[in-house]
Amino acid sequence: MSKVGTGDSKNTLYCSFCGKSQHEVRKLIAGPTVFICDECVELCMDIIREENKSSLVKSRDGIPTPKEICKVLDDYVIGQGHAKKVLSVAVHNHYKRLNHQTKHNDVELAKSNILLIGPTGSGKTLLAQTLARILDVPFTMADATTLTEAGYVGEDVENIILKLLQSADYNVERAQRGIVYIDEIDKISRKSDNPSITRDVSGEGVQQALLKIMEGTVASVPPQGGRKHPQQEFLQVDTTNILFICGGAFSGLEKIISARGRTTSIGFAAQVLAPEDRRTGEIFRHVEPEDLLKYGLIPEFVGRLPVVATLEDLDEASLKKILTDPKNALVKQYQRLFEMENIELTFADEALGAVARKAIERKTGARGLRSILESILLETMFDLPGLEGVEEVVISREVVEGTARPLYIYADRADRASETSASA
């Protein structure tokens, strides 16, 4: 900071960057031994914005191929090959479309939002989370059951955009290229086929409210969240390029699809859809827009979800793989917990099969695996920190079935294995 002249001028402050005096600029901000004017701050902001834009363009050019996307999904999600293919192609095309828009204006490519239909615990949420991780874009999840129309008690649909903005650290440009996953979308279906005379604020009303942001609109988002009021300043977020993925278990939809199959008089559909012994996931593969309309989704909402990916029930082999194969597999997680006590945790192959069968019986899919393992290992995790000399814990099929206790193998004497026979 320099001071020029004499008299009054010796008390004049100057910008350390451009040299302008405090009288030539609107604001002069003081730092330790330096000053910066508002014009230099604006110039610095412009430079940063340009750098951010150029880095964004680089990421746009590096869109992973559908095969690359599918390969990474395989690391985290077991099975569901058909759903992975549909998602990989849809997401690749979505970001290719954004890249196309920055270079060409002759043909406008429409956005293709995605609907995931599958039984509970089949991997819908995990697929969406993994996609966001692959693409390194802002990602947020919303629960459709908490949403209501604007003005009613509950969460506004625009709060979804606020959450996305928060995950992008309030970088509007990054948020506008993000992914929104709306779970439990089947819970906002219309309560009956006929329009009701009473207001359905958490069903059809929410579908109507979601239409605009899914298609593309400029949403006014209150930065601090909560309800809007006139004195508030809003952030403007364009939702045109945000990819919406909706997921739901759609319990009962298989009956609608099967009923349609039985009414088919000719062709292959009657034989394909009618059998009662077909698994839910297999029946979902034959879903048509008319089935979703009968279920209670309004036509405009179904039209906003042109890509439909169906997930199948997980069989015993798939559930066993989920326990051991992914990078964040449950068995690996518990083994790491036991390693912290310097103890090795071992599961017999038959034990993993028994855990998988329990999950199938409970109809909870992969989501139920953790609770089953927690109940099996509860007593062991309670006792172990107070025991000395335990080197290994072995879980057998009998332990899972509740007819025996885990086998404790001690380091000092192999014959001191604590093996409790089947309880009566």
Curated annotation (Swiss-Prot):
GO molecular function: ATP binding; ATP hydrolysis activity; ATP-dependent protein folding chaperone; protein dimerization activity; unfolded protein binding; zinc ion binding
SMART domains: AAA, ClpB_D2-small, zf-C4_ClpX
Annotated GO CC locations: HslUV protease complex
Annotated keywords: ATP-binding, Chaperone, Metal-binding, Nucleotide-binding, Zinc
Coiled coil (UniProt feature): none
Positions bound to ATP: P119, T120, G121, S122, G123, K124, T125, L126
Domain ClpX-type ZB: 3-56
GO biological process, one term: proteolysis involved in protein catabolic process
Binding-site residues for Zn(2+), renumbered to this chain: C15, C18, C37, C40
Pfam families registered for this protein in UniProt: AAA_2, ClpB_D2-small, zf-C4_ClpX
Quaternary structure and interacting proteins, as annotated: Component of the ClpX-ClpP complex. Forms a hexameric ring that, in the presence of ATP, binds to fourteen ClpP subunits assembled into a disk-like structure with a central cavity, resembling the structure of eukaryotic proteasomes.
UniProt record similarity statement: Belongs to the ClpX chaperone family.
Function noted in UniProt: ATP-dependent specificity component of the Clp protease. It directs the protease to specific substrates. Can perform chaperone functions in the absence of ClpP.
PANTHER family assigned to the protein according to its UniProt record, in alphabetical order: ATP-DEPENDENT CLP PROTEASE ATP-BINDING SUBUNIT CLPX-LIKE, MITOCHONDRIAL, ATP-DEPENDENT CLP PROTEASE ATP-BINDING SUBUNIT CLPX-LIKE, MITOCHONDRIAL-RELATED
NCBIfam families in the record: clpX, PRK05342.1
Record's protein name: ATP-dependent Clp protease ATP-binding subunit ClpX
Biological classification of the source: Bacteria, Pseudomonadati, Pseudomonadota, Alphaproteobacteria, Hyphomicrobiales
